[in-house]
Each structure stands twice: as C-alpha cells, then as structure tokens.
Amino acid sequence: MTPADLADLLRTTATAVLTERDLDTAALPATVTVERPRNPEHGDYATNLALQVGKKVGVNPRELAGWLAEALTATAGIASAEVAGPGFVNLRIEAAAQNVIVGDIITSAERYGHSAALAERNINLEFVSANPTGPIHIGGTRWAAVGDALGRLLATQGAAVVREYYFNDHGAQIDRFVSSLIAAAKGEPTPEDGYAGSYIGDIAAQVLAKDPGALELPDDEMRETFRAIGVDLMFDHIKISLHDFGTDFDVFTHEDSMHTSGRVEEAIARLRENGAIYEKDGATWLRTTDFGDDKDRVVIKSDGAPAYIAGDLAYFLDKRQRGFDLCIYMLGADHHGYIARLKAAAAALGDDPDTVEVMIGQMVNLVRDGQPVRMSKRAGTVITLDDLVEAIGVDAARYSLIRSSVDTPIDIDLALWSSASNENPVYYVQYAHARLSALARNAADLGVVADTAHLDLLTHDKEGTLIRNLGEFPRVLESAAALREPHRVCRYLEDLAGDYHRFYDSCRVLPQGDEAPGSLHQARLALCQATRQVIANGLAILGVSAPERM
C-alpha cells in the first residue's frame, strides 16, 4: 500500500463514515493528506483529516477521528488505527500490504515516481541565457544545474518541456566584447569597460586565424567581422562547457532575431491595440503600472533605439505564439525587479500574468581552506563553470548547486565536495548505489535471485522504515515539481541512503558460508533491487551518475 493508496482509502472510508451518519461528504477535501510521523512510535502514517472536516460537518474532530479509526481498523491492510491529540489518526500498515511497494518499484523500473500530474502543461523553461561575452560564471552554472534538473523533474510529471537558451547577442555588452577582441588582436590594453581574461586573447587569435586580414578592414567591417566570428566562437565554447556539464538545450533563440524579424514591432503593435502604449518626451512608453509594476517602462527611447524590455516583450509573445501555456524564467539575484515587469508585460499583451513564472537565484561562493576563492585564471575576474568542474568534477558540481533552495545563497567547500567521505552528500548517495550494485553482483555469484513472492517476511523495523521511504518517492517528485524545487530530490536521496545503510547494517541480505539461500534472502534482495532503482531514478533527475563501483 503506497501513501497514495492509503490517501485514497482514507477518502473512501471517510465518505462511508459521513454518509452513514447523514453528514455532508462535500466537506471532504479533494485530496487527503497522509504524513509520516516524526516519531515512528506513533505509527507508520498519520492524517489530520478529522481536524479538516469535523467543524465543517458540526462534529467534534476527535469524535470524527474515532469513527474513522474504528472503520479503518476493520479494513484489510490496516494493522491499527488510533486517535491522537485533538483529532489526528495514527495508522500502522500490515507488512503484507505495505511491502507491495517493492514489487511496484521493480515493475515500474525507470518510470517509478512518474505521474500525469502536469500532463496538460506545455512549458517553456528558459535558463542560463548568459551573454556570449565570456565563459559561464558560477551563478550561471547554478542555473545550468538547477534548470536542467527542473526540466527533467517536470517531465517526470507528464509536462511537455522545452529547454531554451536566450542568446543575448544584441546591445552594448556585445560592443564592449568586440572592442576587447580588437584590442587583444592589436596587442593593446583591454579597454576600460572591456572584458579581460586569457579567453579574450584566445578568441582574438582564432578570429585572425579565420580571417587573417580582419585588422586591415575598414572600421565598421572590422568590427562586424570580429563580432560575427567572435560571438560564434564564444558561444561554441559555452555550448561545449554546458554539454560537458550534462546540460543541453532544445532551442537557442537569438535576441537579435527579435529585432531583425519584426517581432519587436509586432509586440508594440499588439500593445497599441490594447491601449497600453503612450508617447512622452519623444519616447514610447508601456503602461506597466496599470498591471502591477512600480513604474511605467520605456519601450522605444527618444533616439529611436529599442529599450531592453522591447526584446523581452517580443520574446514573450513569441513563446506564447509557439503554444507554451507556462513560461518559466530563471534569473539571477540582480533581476528581482523583472518579476513584476514580466508579469505586467504579459498582462499588457492581453495575456494571463500567471503564464509567467520567474525564479530568482541567489549567489554562489566557493571556499577553499576556509578562504573564499574569487579569481578565475581563464576569465580573469569571476569563477566559471569550467573552474568548478575542474576542482570537484561534474557530479559533485551539479549536486552541490542543486541541493539548496535557489533563493538561498550557498557556499561550496571545495575540499568537502571533492572528498570520498560520508560528509560529502553526493558521495554518500552514490556510495549507497555502488554498494547496492556490488550486492547484486555478489548475489548473482551465489545464485540468489530477487523474488517478491515472500515480501511478507520483511518485518524488521529497519526494513519497514526503508520500504515506507521508498513509497514516498512519487510524492517527493510531485511536490518538488509543483514547487519548482529540485533540491527536495537531493534531500530525499540522502535520507533514503541513510535508511538503506542502516538496514544493511542490521539485516543480512545474502547467505553466509554453507547457508542455503532462502525466501528471506530473496525478499531482502528484492528490497535492495527496489532501493537501487529509486536511487538511480533520483540521480538521473539530477543529472548525476549512479556508479556501479566506487
């Protein structure tokens, strides 16, 4: 009996209890919640259903809890149901009913934990979207890990997800990048507002290798040559770094295309039709204050140049025209003001602001020997994705960045995350998978085969704890997807790995010496197979490997 099965049973039982007493069943919530008590002595699961419903139907919650407990006790699969406190019901599940979770996991395999909770959603997930003016910095690396994991997580719940990178190749930052490349190619110092780092010299040299006469061209042609070739080279490096990090995108959209394709003009025309545009001081303004923004925004400057928001408006309209019903933007801490701005822009275009969802990520700091690490040899100023991977590897880098809520600043201790110790969270989880894999190999050598026919033999308290936690995996995925919080998967896996290690230390899985394999060995091996599957499924969502050996 999974937690979902138990929730359904509770609702069915509550419906019968209320109907029998001529009480209004409409008071029942659409979804009944069951939780695992903090103190296992209180039972396997608990529900506050009587507290939710009692007052609505005019019955003391504790009395209603008593009716529910009495009915549940007489139900197959329920070992006991007891009233606690003002109206809680603590439940114990019969081992035979609880242990079917193991068989469900083995049967479902890679799809265990998947659901159709988001099957109707068509989601555009935009993340990283770093300017092609330098390597991915550590903040962008956090989004590369979290965004990719979130995309995988949403897909497990049935959503159609398109991962998109908005390629900012329009504006002043590109002009500064080009000036920096030209200065490097000429052997001149970096411009005051330019980009430093050895990568600038490398790209400048590659531009000259592709077009040896670039520096001899007229100024405008020279700048365009360095722009076209340099931006392509930089973006190729970014794509390779992201791919090596395990993050790939379905779509790359160029900001410049919003301006050259007429998309900006189309968006402004739509806004004019909606009465959301006005002219003042020679500029074109958007009435975003009518839709919750703190001030109106300039769309076209007085010199005729489009403001940055013009591209945002065109890009959002483009996404909606491609059929997305939810557009998730993952932005850095310095973009907090974009939340109201983007939602107001959606409303001004005549759309539902809830089609826009903005996630703001906080800072990432690296620490070595208790001291902050601030400089990158390649980038010159900031720590990059490549720096982090070189220091601790892809798996540890991804896990360390996903493990905390994005609205929390994080410090990554390079010594900790590169260590082979239980204090290293990713090592702890991966070691559990490797240990389970070794167990499977040893079982094969001994001729022991996992069998779910005798799961009723799994009665040890450590077995029960492990099985109940395995049953939580679908709920963890559903809630993590709904809340856009992939870090919940990390915390769950660490908890599950701990339950497995404690089970392994208390319950011998394989026969020893001349002992013949028995039904208990086979049942425990099935439990281990299920545990290994869930850990592998969770790590796959995070984009972290599940090693067979360590």
From Swiss-Prot:
It is an enzyme of class 6 (ligase). Disulfide bonds: none annotated. A motif ('HIGH' region) lies at residues 130-140. It holds the Pfam family tRNA-synt_1d. GO terms for biological process: arginyl-tRNA aminoacylation. Its main location: cytoplasm. It catalyses: tRNA(Arg) + L-arginine + ATP = L-arginyl-tRNA(Arg) + AMP + diphosphate. GO terms for molecular function: arginine-tRNA ligase activity; ATP binding. It is found in: Cytoplasm. The keyword Transmembrane helix does not apply. GO terms for cellular component: cytoplasm. Its EC number is 6.1.1.19. Keywords: Aminoacyl-tRNA synthetase, ATP-binding, Cytoplasm, Ligase, Nucleotide-binding, Protein biosynthesis. Belongs to the class-I aminoacyl-tRNA synthetase family. HAMAP family: Arg_tRNA_synth. Monomer. PANTHER family: ARGININE--TRNA LIGASE, CYTOPLASMIC (PTHR11956:SF5), ARGINYL-TRNA SYNTHETASE (PTHR11956). This is Arginine--tRNA ligase. It comes from Mycobacterium sp. (strain KMS). The lineage of its organism: Bacteria, Bacillati, Actinomycetota, Actinomycetes, Mycobacteriales. The gene is argS.
